[in-house]
Structures are given as structure tokens and as C-alpha cells.
Amino acid sequence: MGTHRIFIGLIALCCFCLPHLIEAKPFGVYQQQVFVDQSGHGNFTTIQKAIDSVPINNRHWFFINVKAGLYREKIKIPYEKPFIVLVGAGKRLTRVEWDDHYSVAQSPTFSTLADNTVVKSITFANSYNFPSKGKMNKNPRTPAVAALIGGDKSAFYSVGFAGIQDTLWDFDGRHYFHRCTIQGAVDFIFGTGQSIYQSCVIQVLGGQLEPGLAGYITAQGRTNPYDANGFIFINCLVYGTGMAFLGRPWRGYSRVIFYNSNLTDVVVPEGWDAWNFVGHENQLVFAEHGCFGSGANIGRRVKWVKKLSESAIQNLADLSFINRGGWVEDLPIPA
């Protein structure tokens, strides 16, 4: 994830991100339900056409059910189409794939700038650098985003995110990821989102990197000590091939917490890297609490890793970190 490329991407996105003004209607109220089926037995044959059918400034939950299959398309939910619920047949059965690359702003296979987006049981993949049938991809490694999440109050249940570099751009807003699988090798969870990752599987694909090169799981972009954002990983599994740091700072007050998570030996002993902020490590909030596994030995961590108080940890590793107003409980979670 090149900093200059990210900056360019942010400028491009700002042209589309208008203030979030629409609030959710009561739980259970929905306007319409449509089906996407490539065989022609649904309302639409592509996911994007189904999204396009949602009314501008929609104010009720709109369910889009996607049948099993490989969907070769780029998908975008614009900011003016909130309250979309996108449901697949399973993250191994419904897969959306594209191979755009280089620009983080233009490459996402899936992007949502709308508030109140809910996705369940789908995988979004950027295939540009992704290994095929276990074989190493020989394309030059470059940013290739699988998903960009830019709206507030958005949740993802049993969703897959597959890529190598910059897989999941957790761009902005409050987000909840539950039982998701995120695959990558370099900065593959990055951005300035205020997010909880609960019971997720983080798979390091270090075998796609040059021999001896360690990857990076997170690159979080908190810019000052008063920013509320950060990435909180709760009861997650970190495993894979090769080696990886838990994170490095994209901005000077980066905040990432791993809580009660299983860290295997894919995690490098040092745990964290200061990257471009050597000498300013005291500003970074990189912490682990209650983690276990062969990669969780904090005795070999960098000396500047944060030692947070029990009360600070409990405040961060709690749904209330993202759930002001109780929006998570009000989501129309598909069965």
C-alpha cells in the first residue's frame, strides 16, 4: 500500500462522499425483495442491475438475494442508496470476482459508500494477484482491492474478502464484521474505519511474497489522539503461510487491538512495525490482550507495544465501541 497512491485514492473518493443524512427506518420494514440469478430465473442476471433498481434515497430495507455462482462483475453501492441488504447462498457458493489493480480508488471489486449496508454469505475477490488453484500468481504485486467499505453503520456476516495487497479497504464509518474470512499478504486490512472484527478468520498468504519477506495484516489510519476510529479484533484466528506483522501504521496515531484471539506462528515475534513513524512509537496504539497460540508470545514483542489498562481494553473490546444508538441490534440480519 503506497502512501501516495492511497492519498490519491482518498481525494478521488471525497468527490463522492457527501454527508450521511439518512437515518434507518424501524427494524423489519422493507420495501422490496428481488433475486439475482445468472440462469435467468430471477429478477436480474447481475448484482449491479439489482442495485441500480433500488430507488434513490431509499429509506426502507431493500433485500437483494443472490443465487450461487461466480459473478464476474464490479459492484458499487452509491452513497444515495442506503438500506440495501445483499444476501448470497454462502461465501463458498456465491463469489464476486474482478481483476482491476494499481489504483486503490478504482480497483475495488465491491464498493459501498452508502450508510446502512448489510451483506451476508458472499465472497468478494480481486483476482489480479490472487493464487489460482494453489499456484502462485505471477502478476507483478500491486494494490488490488477486493472491497471498499465507506458508509456508516454497515455490517458483514460470513463474508469473504480475498486478495493479496490492500484486500479490504475499511475506509470510513462504523462497521461490524462477524465470522468473516479475510485473505491477503500486504496491508490487507487498511483504512480509517471504526470497526469491530468478531470471530473472523485472518488468513495470511505469505507464500505469494518474495522469499523471506514478511507481510502486514493491518495498516490503520487514525490521524490524531481524539479520532474515534480503530480496528478491534475479538476472538479471531490469525493463520496462514509465510510470516506477517500484526500491523504497521498508515497514519501517526494508528490504533489496532487484538483481543482474546488465536495467533499462530505466522505472526513474526516482534508483532508490530513502526514503518514511517520510527521515533513516534508512543503515539501508536498497538496492543494485544488475552491472546493465545504459538504466535502470541508477548515477551518478544517490540518494546513500545501499548500496555493498556483493563478498563481501557474493556471499553475498546466491546460492541459499544461502534454501537452508539444501538444500530447493530436494529439491523435486519438475514437468517
UniProtKB/Swiss-Prot annotation:
It is found in: Secreted, Cell wall. Expressed in flower buds. Coiled coil: none annotated. Residues 1-24 form the signal peptide. Keywords: Aspartyl esterase, Cell wall, Cell wall biogenesis/degradation, Glycoprotein, Hydrolase, Secreted, Signal. It catalyses: [(1->4)-alpha-D-galacturonosyl methyl ester](n) + n H2O = [(1->4)-alpha-D-galacturonosyl](n) + n methanol + n H(+). Acts in the modification of cell walls via demethylesterification of cell wall pectin. This is Probable pectinesterase 29.
